[in-house]
């Protein structure tokens, strides 16, 4: 009896520890495989689902995981052996925090919603849709099908009754949230309040240090390889080249669903890959600067400041529309809503004396609008982290 009691005590402690970490088990969507909705390697798509409760039982956050893109067979093949290209390598449990957090103290507006993290394994921001599978490389470019299969599954699990819903994401997942935002709105009940949140997904059609646009050629390869054109918003592709419709600044003007953009003006991923990508930095003069802005020369800092100017212009469709929200800090960071510390913590970034969680919550519920742009230099905001962060 004593041993049984001890066993139950151990299980109780273990349960408390698991609940305390916010670990949410993985769900493999095996039924999607027959529809051809699969990861790069052909494995089933996956997500983590923490059910809502209390007043949040009919409210839903669907959060799209980030993780860059693959532009050719070689880079996509590399992903096949990792969680970025196969659900076989994904961690079985995922700790929810930040915008997905389940604690009222750190996520007061959304803690009891149905919270879903959609895993990213297609390399196309959930836009790929190529029917043919090359027998030589056995790569599947089916991101758009994965997206639809996951949404259909969630609808069957109760999202069809949603009263409030948010489609959000980080980085490449945040771009997906923008690209699929209006479609998400159309799927849900007409009476539901549906909005979208992009965290570090506002990738700009910017110039690099040579005066060219490396990122445009990069996105062109993504769109061509994955057959993304037919999955991008028609309101954009009817006016310009499909690869340009990977840039939010060309998609947002015709979006009908309210959008909140969380971004760093000195986005660390974009400084490294839009402004000073290794491919154009032949002499590696930017190697140290782009990792730590404190190591930039005066001339480099001027160029970095010019990148912020490009960001400001690209964001004009956001701050020119009252229904949209904007939290643009001057941090050297990328994805700031994924941890409790940066989402709502005492030491998290602030703009206009407001933390991200409060800004997004107030905007979603219509308590107050929020379109705030931080001070202009990369060292002006003392609430920014001391070192570059990429959650």
UniProtKB/Swiss-Prot annotation:
Q: Does the keyword Nucleotide-binding apply?
A: no
| Entry keyword set | Cell wall, Cell wall biogenesis/degradation, Hydrolase, Secreted, Signal
Is Transcription regulation among the key words of this record? no
- Name any GO cellular component annotation: plasmodesma
Q: What is its EC number?
A: 3.1.1.-
Cross-referenced Pfam families? PAE
Active-site residues, record numbering mapped to chain:
171 (charge relay system), 267 (charge relay system), 334 (charge relay system)
Q: Which InterPro entries match?
A: PAE/NOTUM
Which locations, inside or outside the cell, does it occupy? Answer: Secreted, Cell wall
Q: Identify this protein by name.
A: Pectin acetylesterase 7
Organism this protein belongs to: Arabidopsis thaliana (Mouse-ear cress)
- Please spell out the taxonomic lineage of the organism that makes this protein: Eukaryota, Viridiplantae, Streptophyta, Embryophyta, Tracheophyta
The protein's gene is named PAE7
């Amino acid at each position: 009896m004593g041993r049984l009691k001890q066993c139950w005590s151990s299980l109780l402690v273990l349960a408390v520890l698991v609940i305390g970490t916010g670990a949410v088990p993985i769900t493999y969507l095996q039924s999607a495989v027959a529809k051809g909705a699969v990861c790069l390697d052909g494995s089933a798509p996956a997500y983590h689902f923490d059910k809502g409760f209390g007043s949040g039982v009919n409210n839903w956050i669907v959060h799209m995981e980030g993780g860059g893109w693959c532009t050719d067979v070689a880079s996509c093949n590399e992903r096949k052996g990792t969680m970025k290209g196969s659900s076989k390598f994904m961690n079985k449990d995922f700790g929810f925090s930040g915008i997905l957090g389940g604690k009222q103290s750190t996520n007061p507006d959304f803690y009891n919603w149905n919270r879903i993290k959609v895993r990213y394994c297609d390399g196309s921001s959930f836009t790929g849709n190529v029917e043919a599978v090359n027998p030589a490389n056995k790569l599947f470019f089916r991101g758009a099908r994965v997206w639809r299969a996951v949404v259909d599954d969630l609808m069957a699990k109760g999202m069809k009754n949603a009263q409030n819903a948010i489609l959000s994401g980080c980085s490449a997942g945040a771009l997906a949230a923008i690209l699929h935002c209006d479609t998400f709105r159309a799927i849900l009940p007409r009476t539901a309040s549906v909005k979208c949140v992009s965290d570090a997904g506002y990738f700009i059609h910017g110039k690099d240090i040579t005066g060219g646009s490396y990122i445009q050629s990069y996105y062109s390869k993504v769109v061509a390889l994955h057959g993304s054109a037919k999955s991008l918003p028609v309101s954009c592709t009817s006016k310009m080249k499909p690869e340009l419709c990977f840039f939010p600044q060309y998609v947002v003007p015709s979006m009908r669903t309210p959008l909140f953009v969380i971004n760093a003006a000195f986005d660390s991923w974009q400084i490294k890959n839009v402004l000073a990508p290794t491919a154009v930095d032949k002499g590696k003069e930017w190697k140290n600067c782009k990792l730590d802005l404190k190591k930039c020369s005066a001339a480099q800092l001027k160029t970095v400041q010019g990148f912020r100017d490009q960001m400001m212009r690209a964001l004009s469709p956001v701050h020119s529309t009252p229904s949209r929200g904007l939290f643009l800090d001057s941090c050297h960071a990328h994805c700031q809503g994924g941890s409790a510390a940066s989402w709502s913590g005492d030491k998290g970034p602030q703009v206009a004396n407001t933390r991200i969680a409060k800004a997004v919550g107030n905007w979603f519920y219509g308590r107050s609008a929020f379109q705030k742009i931080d001070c202009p230099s990369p060292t002006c905001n003392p609430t920014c982290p001391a070192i570059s962060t990429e959650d």
